[in-house]
Curated annotation (Swiss-Prot):
Family: Belongs to the ABC transporter superfamily. ABCG family. PDR (TC 3.A.1.205) subfamily.
PTM characteristics: Ubiquitinylation mediates endocytosis and vacuolar degradation. Phosphorylation by casein kinase I stabilizes the protein half-life.
Biotechnology: Strains lacking PDR5 are used for toxicity tests. Strains overexpressing PDR5 are used for screening antifungal sensitizers.
Any GO MF annotation of the entry: ATP binding
Official protein name in the record: Pleiotropic ABC efflux transporter of multiple drugs
Organism of provenance: Saccharomyces cerevisiae (strain ATCC 204508 / S288c) (Baker's yeast)
Length: 1511
C-alpha cells in the first residue's frame, strides 16, 4: 500500500482547493496595466505571504506546523493535477492516480500549494476541539435481568410508567466519568483502554454522535468556538466519527461507492476550469490509489452474503470514504481492525501527513498498537472503566506511569504498557516503591485521583483553558466562510451539506440506478416471477368470462380483487430492502453527505421504472387471460388504477419501515395493515354490510376507492344476459317474462338481462359518477404517503444503543438483591456484576509459580492428555474450477501433552486449513499423508475426543454461561459419568477459567451480554467441559482482542498446558511478550509449506538462532521476534526473502531431527495401544433419545427466553383473528352472511406468511450454531437437532391455535350455528382441532422450506409462493366447476382445499337459511295461482329454496337456498366429510415434516461418500 496520505487531505485541501492551475492563469486573472509583469508578480507574492502569515497566526496554538508553514511560506504554486493527456506539458506522474509512479504525499502537498496560492478563494481554515468536565451516561437495563415470556409484559409496563414518573432516582449508569482534553489543529491523539473502558463513548462524545447516551450537564465541548449543537446543525461534515463496522451497499463497485461520496463532497470553490464530474472522478481515483484499491475499481464491495472485495479491502473502502469527506476533525474507532500491522502503520502515517500538511486533527482508538504507530501520535489518552487516568504528550506517558509505580517489561510496546496498567493480572508493580511503603494507585478511581493531582493535569487544564480562550469570533467566522465557500449555489448557508437538496437527489438517483444495474438478476427475477403469477392466476379464470352473462359476476369481482391485492402488496418486501440500506444512510448522514429524505426521494424515483415494468407485465397478462372487457379505454383505466395501487401501497409500506426502528417491529404493523386493507377493500364485505364500528376503515382505505373504480370500469354500461331464472323447468316453458326473474342482484322482472350498473349498485353501492373519484383519492394517497415517508426518513432516529452490561435470569437477580450484592442503582456497575472480572482487588494473580499452579490443578482434576498427536507428509488439495490447488504441502509435526504449540504464518499460509484437516472438519478436497494418535489412525470417536475453539465465538445467546458448559458436559462426556460428577467438573472449569462472577450471566449479544474476553473464555470452557482426551485446537483466539485480553487468553492456555493438556493454537503476529508464552512453533509460508518446526526457547532464542544460522539478518534486541521472522521469510508487507526458506528447512538438521522423532513415534507409540476403549468408539457419547431430550429442553428454554418471538406470534394471532372475528361479527345465515362466513374462513389462513416468516430466522439461528460448532464436535446428531425443532415448535403452535380458536370462533357466530344444529360440543371441539392443526401446518411448512435453504428470505419467498398457489386453487375465489380442467389437479392437491372445506362445513352446516330482504327474488305469479302453487314444480326440481309467503297472489318473494348445506354443496363442502378432510390435512402436516427431515439430510448433512477423499 502506498504511503496513504489521506484523501482527507484531498478534501481538506481540495474542499476549498479549486483554483488556478498555474501562475500564468493567476496573472491573467489579476492583470493590471499600471505595472509590468515583474512588479505584478512581486505584489502578488507579498499579498500571499501576508495572507499566509495571517492564517498561521489564527492557528498558532497548533504545535507541529513545520510542513504547513513551509508550504505557506515557500511561495511555490501548485499545478492542476487533473490531466486529460499524459503527454500534456507539465504532466507529473506523481500527481496522476492512474500512474504507477503516483505519490499521494506529493499529491497532498500539491493541493496544499494550490490552496496557499489563493487563500481568498480557497478559504483555508482549521478546527480544534477542547472538552471540559466531559461525562456520559446511558440508559440502564432495569433491568439487568433476562426477559422471558412471562416477565416481558411487566418490564414493558414498568418501563412505560417510568417515562411518566419524575423520580429522583434516575435509571441511568455512568459510562464516562468527568474528564478533560484538548486537541489542536495538526495533532493526532490515540485513545487507549481495554474493551468496556469507554473509548468508543469518548470518540462519539467529542464527535457529537451522542445518540443512545447523554452527556453530563456540566460537560463543555468547544470546536473552535462552536458548540456540539452548532456542529450537528451546521457543520456536521467537519467533525466525523468512523465506526468500527464496515457497512456499504454491497452491489456497488468500489469506484461507484467512492465517486458518489466525491460527488456529494465536491466543493463549489474547486480548481478553476474543472467541472464537478471530472473533479469527483479524480478524487475517487486518488482515494483508490492512495489506499491500494485501484485494482478493485470494478469489483463489488460485497458483504457476508454478496461476494466482493476482501474484508481488509472493505475496511480500506471505509477509510477512503472518510478521507474523501475531507473533515477537519476525525474520530476513528478501531479503524485498524482487520488490517495487518504494516497496513495499519501506513494508515497512521497517512493521518500524520494529513495533520502536518492540512492542519487536520484526528483521534484514533486502537486495541493493538505497535511502537512505530504509537510514536506518530502527539498525544495519548488512557481510560480505565470510564475514568481518565492520563491525557497528555505521548512521549511523556510512559514516564508518568513509571513514576506512578509501574514497571514496563522489556520488549513491551509503550501502548501495551499503558493499557497493561489497567489490568491487575498483567501489570507489574515497582517493588522498590512498595518496600518503601509508597502507595501505588491500583483501582480506576485511585488512578484518576492521582491524575487529577498531578502536574501533568495542571498543564492540560492550562492548555484547555487557553484553547477555549482562543476560540473567538474570528475563528468561528473563518470556519463559516470556508463552509459557505464550499457549498453549491442553491445550498442553504446554514445547511451542513455541501451540495443542494436536488443535487443530492440527482447523485443518489444515479447511485441507485447503478445498484439496480449491478443486481439486475433480482429485477429480472421479480419480472419473471410476476409474469408467472399472472399466468397462473389469470388461467384460473380462463374462459369463464367468455360467456359474458350474469354467471360471471362473482368471478369478475373475484378476479378484480385478486388483481388489486396482488398489485398493492407486491411492494410489501420493500421493507426488507429499507432495513438493508438504513445503516448506510445513517452513516452517511453523520458524514453530512446527504439528507436521509434525499436518499428516500432517490430510492422512490429509481424504482419507478422497475415498478412500472412489473405492473405492466403482470396486468397485461392477467387482464387478457381473464378476458375482461376488450375495450381500449377500459383496459388503460384498469392499468392506471392498478399502477396507482402499486405506488400508494409502496409508499405506505415505506412509511411503516421508516417509522419503526427494527425489522421485527416493522413486520407486525405491516402484517396487520395487509389484513385490514384486504378485508375492507369492499369485496370480502360490501360497504353496506360493514358494521358501523369498523366502517371508518373502509373510508380511509385507499384500496377501497381503487377497487370501486375498477368494478365501475368493468361493469358500467354493459347488459349481461341472464344465465339463470327462477322459476325454471319444463313446467314453466310458456310463462310470461314478468312471471320469472333473473337470479342475481339488480335483476328486473320481465328483462332477460341485468345492467352492470344495477348489479354493482345493488351489491356494492357503487355508482358510475364515482369512477374517477377513486383515481383522485388514490393519487392523493400516493402524494400524502410519499411526503410522510420523506418526513419520517428525515427525522426518525435509529434504535438507541445500550451500554455494555451483563444480563442475568430474574431468579439470579432476586438472589443477588437478597444478598445485597445488587440494587437497581448499581445493577449496571461492572464491578458489581463482573463485567471486568479482572478488576477485583482480591483476584488471584496469574503470575503464580508453576509449583503452586500444579498443586491447584491437582485439586481441580482437569482432564489430562495421555497420547501424542502427530502427522506426517500431510497434503491437502482442492479443485478450483479446472485447477487443482495444493493448500498444504507435506506438513509434519506433533503436539505432546503439556505443551503449547503456536501455528503461525502469513495470510493464505493454510493455518486454519491445517487445523481443520487435523480435526476432521474439512468436507471437500483430497487429503494425503498420515494423521495418527500414538501411531494409530483416528477412529470415529476422534472428533469428540478433541476440543476445537473456533475463531468465531458461537454460543446460544439465551443460555447462561453455566448452562452452556453443562450442556457440553452432559452430551460430550461419557454416558457412564454421573450428572453430579459432570456438574462438579463444570464448576471446576468455571473456577480455573475465572468465570465465577458471571457464571450465571446470560451469553446475550454484543453490548447486552458477555464482552469479547468473556465470550472467548466461554468458548474455551465449552471445549474443556467435554474433557478432551487428546488435545485442544484454538483458531486465532486473540483475533480482534486488545493486547491485554490477548495476553490473558495466552496465560490461560499456558495454565492448561502446565496441567498436561496438549494445545495447538494459530496466532496472527503476536507481540514479543505473547510469543514467549509458547513452547514450540510450527511456522508456515504461503502455499502451506513448513519453514520451521521446533522449540522457541527462552526469549525465542532457539528459533532466532535457527534463522540467523541460515542466512537471516540479525534480530535487533528490541524487535518483536514474530515480526522479525515474518520479515525474514518475506511474509510481511513490502519484505522479500533472500532465499526459499522452505527448501532451507527441508535440507536442515532440524528437519532431519523431526523426521527421526516421527519415525520413533510411529514405531514405538503403537505398542502402548489405543487410548480409546472399544466400547467408547461410537460417534456420539450419548444415545439419540438422550440427545433429543436435552436438545429439546434447551430449545424450549430458548423459546421461553425469547419473548419477542413468542409474543410476536401471539400478538399477530390475537390481532388477526380478533380483527376477522369482529369484522364478520355475528355473520348470520343470510346469503351474504354465508358468503361472509366463507370469506372469514378464507381469511383465517392469511396469517400463514407472518407466522412462518417469524419462525424461519429462529430456525436459521439454531441451525447455524449446530452446523458450525455442535455437529463438527459430535455434540449431538442431526436427527436430535431436527426432531427437537419439531417437538418444541408444535406445542407453541397448538397454543397459538387455541388462542385463535377462542377469539375467532365465537365472535363470528359459528357457535350459534352449532347450537342451532344441536352439535355444540362436537363441532366446537372439531373446530379447535382444525385451528390447532392449521398453526402446526404453518410450522411444518416452515421446516420444509428452510430445511434445504441457506437463507431465511429465500425460504420465505418459496413458502409464500406455495401458499399463494394453494390458496388460489382451494375453491373459494373460483369454484372447481368453473376452473379450467388443467388446474383441477391443483384443486385436489392443495391442502387448503380440504382445510377450508372442512372448517366451513364444521362452522355453518345443518342450519336453516334466512335471506335478507334485498336478497329475495320477486316476481308475479300467473293470475289465479298462489305463489306456493306456482313454485311447487320448481321446488320439487331444485330441492332447495323457500317462499316467504306461499299464499301470496300478487308478488312472490323467493329465497334461493333453504339450508346451509345447500350453500356448502355449491363449494363442494360436505359435513359428512369433516373427519376425512381432517385426516387428509394431518397427512399433509406429516408429509411436510417427513419431507423436511429428508431434505435436511439430503442438502445439509455431510455424507461419507461426499466430496472429501483420503489417500
Amino acid at each position: 500500500m502506498p504511503e496513504a496520505k489521506l484523501n482527507n487531505n484531498v478534501n481538506d485541501v481540495t474542499s476549498y482547493s479549486s483554483a488556478s492551475s498555474s501562475t500564468e492563469n493567476a496573472a491573467d486573472l489579476h492583470n493590471y496595466n499600471g505595472f509590468d509583469e515583474h512588479t505584478e508578480a512581486r505584489i502578488q507574492k507579498l499579498a500571499r505571504t501576508l495572507t499566509a502569515q495571517s492564517m498561521q497566526n489564527s492557528t498558532q496554538s497548533a504545535p507541529n506546523k513545520s510542513d504547513a508553514q513551509s508550504i505557506f511560506s515557500s511561495g511555490v504554486e501548485g499545478v492542476n493535477p487533473i490531466f486529460s493527456d499524459p503527454e500534456a506539458p507539465g504532466y507529473d506522474p506523481k500527481l496522476d492516480p492512474n500512474s504507477e509512479n503516483f505519490s499521494s504525499a506529493a499529491w497532498v502537498k500539491n493541493m496544499a500549494h494550490l490552496s496557499a496560492a489563493d487563500p481568498d478563494f480557497y478559504k483555508p481554515y482549521s478546527l480544534g476541539c477542547a472538552w471540559k468536565n466531559l461525562s456520559a451516561s446511558g440508559a440502564s437495563a432495569d433491568v439487568a435481568y433476562q426477559s422471558t415470556v412471562v416477565n416481558i409484559p411487566y418490564k414493558i409496563l414498568k418501563s412505560g410508567l417510568r417515562k411518566f414518573q419524575r423520580s429522583k432516582e434516575t435509571n441511568t449508569f455512568q459510562i464516562l466519568k468527568p474528564m478533560d482534553g484538548c486537541l489542536n489543529p495538526g495533532e493526532l491523539l490515540v485513545v487507549l483502554g481495554r474493551p468496556g473502558s469507554g473509548c468508543t463513548t469518548l470518540l462519539k462524545s467529542i464527535s457529537s454522535n451522542t445518540h443512545g447516551f447523554d452527556l453530563g450537564a456540566d460537560t463543555k465541548i468547544s470546536y473552535s468556538g462552536y458548540s456540539g449543537d452548532d456542529i450537528k446543525k451546521h457543520f456536521r461534515g467537519e467533525v466525523v466519527y468512523n465506526a468500527e463496522a464496515d457497512v456499504h451497499l454491497p452491489h456497488l463497485t468500489v469506484f461507484e461507492t467512492l465517486v458518489t461520496v466525491a460527488r456529494l463532497k465536491t466543493p463549489q470553490n474547486r480548481i478553476k476550469g474543472v467541472d464537478r464530474e471530472s473533479y469527483a472522478n479524480h478524487l475517487a481515483e486518488v482515494a483508490m490509489a492512495t489506499y491500494g484499491l485501484s485494482h478493485t475499481r470494478n469489483t463489488k464491495v460485497g458483504n457476508d452474503i454478496v461476494r466482493g472485495v476482501s474484508g481488509g479491502e472493505r475496511k480500506r473502502v471505509s477509510i477512503a470514504e472518510v478521507s474523501i469527506c475531507g473533515s477537519k476533525f476525525q474520530c476513528w474507532d478501531n479503524a485498524t481492525r482487520g488490517l495487518d500491522s504494516a497496513t495499519a502503520l501506513e494508515f497512521i502515517r497517512a493521518l500524520k501527513t494529513q495533520a502536518d500538511i492540512s492542519n487536520t486533527s484526528a483521534t484514533v482508538a486502537i486495541y493493538q498498537c505497535s511502537q512505530d504507530a504509537y510514536d506518530l501520535f502527539n498525544k495519548v489518552c488512557v481510560l480505565d472503566d470510564g475514568y481518565q487516568i492520563y491525557y497528555g504528550p505521548a512521549d511523556k506517558a510512559k514516564k508518568y506511569f513509571e513514576d506512578m509505580g509501574y514497571v514496563c517489561p522489556s520488549r513491551q510496546t509503550t501502548a501495551d504498557f499503558l493499557t497493561s496498567v489497567t489490568s491487575p493480572s498483567e501489570r507489574t508493580l515497582n517493588k522498590d516503591m512498595l518496600k518503601k511503603g509508597i502507595h501505588i494507585p491500583q483501582t480506576p478511581k485511585e488512578m484518576n485521583d492521582y491524575w487529577v493531582k498531578s502536574p501533568n493535569y495542571k498543564e492540560l487544564m492550562k492548555e484547555v483553558d487557553q484553547r477555549l480562550l482562543n476560540d473567538d469570533e474570528a475563528s468561528r467566522e473563518a470556519i463559516k466562510e470556508a463552509h459557505i465557500a464550499k457549498q453549491s449555489k442553491r445550498a442553504r448557508p446554514s445547511s451542513p451539506y455541501t451540495v443542494s437538496y436536488m443535487m443530492q437527489v440527482k447523485y443518489l438517483l444515479i447511485r441507485n440506478m447503478w445498484r439496480l444495474r449491478n443486481n439486475i438478476g433480482f429485477t429480472l427475477f421479480m419480472i419473471l416471477g410476476n409474469c408467472s403469477m399472472a399466468l397462473i392466476l389469470g388461467s384460473m379464470f380462463f374462459k369463464i368470462m367468455k360467456k359474458g352473462d350474469t354467471s360471471t359476476f362473482y368471478f369478475r369481482g373475484s378476479a378484480m380483487f385478486f388483481a388489486i391485492l396482488f398489485n398493492a402488496f407486491s411492494s410489501l418486501l420493500e421493507i426488507f430492502s429499507l432495513y438493508e440500506a438504513r445503516p448506510i444512510t445513517e452513516k452517511h448522514r453523520t458524514y453530512s453527505l446527504y439528507h436521509p429524505s434525499a436518499d428516500a426521494f432517490a430510492s422512490v424515483l429509481s424504482e419507478i421504472p422497475s415498478k412500472l415494468i412489473i405492473a405492466v407485465c403482470f396486468n397485461i397478462i392477467f387482464y387478457f387471460l381473464v378476458d375482461f372487457r376488450r375495450n381500449g379505454g377500459v383496459f388503460f383505466f384498469y392499468l392506471l388504477i392498478n399502477i396507482v395501487a402499486v405506488f400508494s401501497m409502496s409508499h405506505l409500506f415505506r412509511c411503516v419501515g421508516s417509522l419503526t426502528k427494527t425489522l421485527s417491529e416493522a413486520m407486525v404493523p405491516a402484517s396487520m395493515l395487509l389484513l385490514a386493507l384486504s378485508m375492507y377493500t369492499g369485496f370480502a364485505i360490501p360497504k353496506k354490510k360493514i358494521l358501523r364500528w369498523s366502517k371508518w376503515i373502509w373510508y380511509i382505505n385507499p384500496l377501497a376507492y381503487l377497487f370501486e373504480s375498477l368494478l365501475i370500469n368493468e361493469f358500467h354500461g354493459i347488459k349481461f344476459p341472464c344465465a339463470e331464472y327462477v322459476p325454471r323447468g319444463p313446467a314453466y316453458a310458456n310463462i310470461s317474462s314478468t312471471e320469472s326473474v333473473c337470479t342475481v342482484v339488480g335483476a328486473v322482472p320481465g328483462q332477460d338481462y341485468v345492467l352492470g350498473d344495477d348489479f354493482i349498485r345493488g351489491t356494492y353501492q357503487y355508482y358510475h359518477k364515482d369512477k374517477w373519484r377513486g383515481f383522485g383519492i388514490g393519487m392523493a394517497y400516493v402524494v400524502f404517503f410519499f411526503f410522510v415517508y420523506l418526513f419520517l426518513c428525515e427525522y426518525n432516529e435509529g434504535a438507541k444503543q445500550k451500554g455494555e452490561i451483563l444480563v442475568f435470569p430474574r431468579s439470579i437477580v432476586k438472589r443477588m438483591k437478597k444478598r445485597g450484592v445488587l440494587t437497581e442503582k448499581n445493577a449496571n456497575d461492572p464491578e458489581n456484576v463482573g463485567e471486568r472480572s479482572d478488576l477485583s482487588s482480591d483476584r488471584k494473580m496469574l503470575q503464580e509459580s508453576s509449583e503452586e499452579e500444579s498443586d491447584t490443578y491437582g485439586e481441580i482434576g482437569l482432564s489430562k492428555s495421555e497420547a501424542i498427536f502427530h502427522w506426517r507428509n500431510l497434503c491437502y488439495e482442492v479443485q478450483i474450477k479446472a485447477e487443482t490447488r495444493r493448500i498444504l504441502n507435506n506438513v509434519d509435526g506433533w503436539v505432546k501433552p503439556g505443551t503449547l504449540t503456536a501455528l503461525m504464518g502469513a495470510s493464505g499460509a493454510g493455518k486454519t486449513t491445517l487445523l481443520d484437516c487435523l480435526a476432521e472438519r474439512v468436507t471437500m478436497g483430497v487429503i494425503t499423508g498420515d494423521i495418527l494418535v500414538n501411531g494409530i489412525p483416528r477412529d470415529k470417536s476422534f472428533p469428540r475426543s478433541i476440543g476445537y475453539c473456533q475463531q468465531q465465538d458461537l454460543h446460544l445467546k439465551t443460555a447462561t454461561v453455566r448452562e452452556s458448559l453443562r450442556f457440553s458436559a452432559y452430551l460430550r462426556q461419557p454416558a457412564e459419568v454421573s450428572i453430579e460428577e459432570k456438574n462438579r467438573y463444570v464448576e471446576e472449569v468455571i473456577k480455573i477459567l475465572e468465570m465465577e462472577k458471571y457464571a450465571d450471566a446470560v451469553v446475550g449479544v454484543a453490548g447486552e451480554g458477555l464482552n469479547v474476553e468473556q465470550r472467548k473464555r466461554l468458548t474455551i470452557g465449552v471445549e474443556l467441559t467435554a474433557k478432551p482426551k487428546l488435545l485442544v485446537f484454538l483458531d486465532e483466539p486473540t483475533s480482534g482482542l486488545d493486547s491485554q485480553t490477548a495476553w490473558s487468553i495466552c496465560q490461560l492456555m499456558k495454565k492448561l498446558a502446565n496441567h498436561g493438556q496438549a494445545i495447538l493454537c494459530t496466532i496472527h503476529q503476536p507481540s514479543a511478550i505473547l510469543m514467549q508464552e509458547f513452547d514450540r512453533l510450527l511456522f508456515m509460508q504461503r502455499g502451506g509449506k513448513t519453514v520451521y518446526f521446533g522449540d522457541l526457547g527462552e526469549g525465542c532464542k532457539t528459533m532466532i538462532d535457527y534463522f540467523e544460522s541460515h542466512g537471516a539478518h540479525k534480530c535487533p534486541a528490541d524487535a518483536n521476534p514474530a515480526e522479525w521472522m515474518l520479515e525474514v521469510v518475506g511474509a510481511a508487507p513490502g519484505s522479500h526473502a533472500n532465499q526459499d526458506y522452505y527448501e532451507v528447512w527441508r535440507n536442515s538438521e532440524e528437519y532431519r531431527a523431526v523426521q527421526s522423532e516421527l519415525d520413533w513415534m510411529e514405531r514405538e507409540l503403537p505398542k502402548k495401544g489405543s487410548i480409546t476403549a472399544a466400547e467408547d468408539k461410537h460417534e456420539f457419547s450419548q444415545s439419540i433419545i438422550y440427545q433429543t431430550k436435552l436438545v429439546s429442553i434447551r430449545l424450549f428454554q430458548q423459546y421461553w427466553r425469547s419473548p419477542d418471538y413468542l409474543w410476536s406470534k401471539f400478538i399477530l394471532t390475537i390481532f388477526n383473528q380478533l380483527f376477522i372475528g369482529f369484522t364478520f361479527f355475528k355473520a348470520g345465515t343470510s346469503l351474504q352472511g354465508l358468503q361472509n362466513q366463507m370469506l372469514a374462513v378464507f381469511m383465517f389462513t392469511v396469517i400463514f406468511n407472518p407466522i412462518l416468516q417469524q419462525y424461519l430466522p429462529s430456525f436459521v439461528q439454531q441451525r447455524d450454531l449446530y452446523e458450525a460448532r455442535e455437529r463438527p464436535s459430535r455434540t449431538f446428531s442431526w436427527i436430535s437437532f431436527i426432531f427437537a425443532q419439531i417437538f418444541v415448535e408444535v406445542p407453541w403452535n397448538i397454543l397459538a391455535g387455541t388462542i385463535a380458536y377462542f377469539i375467532y370462533y365465537y365472535p363470528i357466530g359459528f357457535y350459534s350455528n352449532a347450537s342451532a344444529a344441536g352439535q355444540l360440543h362436537e363441532r366446537g371441539a372439531l373446530f379447535w382441532l382444525f385451528s390447532c392443526a392449521f398453526y402446526v401446518y404453518v410450522g411444518s411448512m416452515g421446516l420444509l422450506v428452510i430445511s434445504f435453504n441457506q437463507v431465511a428470505e429465500s425460504a420465505a419467498n418459496l413458502a409464500s409462493l406455495l401458499f399463494t398457489m394453494s390458496l388460489s386453487f382451494c375453491g373459494v375465489m373460483t369454484t372447481p366447476s368453473a376452473m379450467p380442467r388443467f388446474w383441477i389437479f391443483m384443486y385436489r392437491v392443495s391442502p387448503l382445499t380440504y382445510f377450508i372445506q372442512a372448517l366451513l362445513a364444521v362452522g355453518v352446516a345443518n342450519v336453516d337459511v334466512k335471506c335478507a330482504d334485498y336478497e329475495l327474488l320477486e316476481f308475479t305469479p300467473p293470475s289465479g295461482m298462489t305463489c306456493g302453487q306456482y313454485m311447487e314444480p320448481y321446488l320439487q326440481l331444485a330441492k332447495t329454496g323457500y317462499l316467504t309467503d306461499e299464499n301470496a297472489t300478487d308478488t312472490c318473494s323467493f329465497c334461493q337456498i333453504s339450508t346451509t348445506n345447500d350453500y356448502l354443496a355449491n363449494v363442494n363442502s360436505f359435513y359428512s366429510e369433516r373427519w376425512r378432510n381432517y385426516g387428509i390435512f394431518i397427512c399433509y402436516i406429516a408429509f411436510n415434516y417427513i419431507a423436511g427431515v429428508f431434505f435436511y439430510w439430503l442438502a445439509r448433512v455431510p455424507k461419507k461418500n461426499g466430496k472429501l477423499s483420503k489417500k
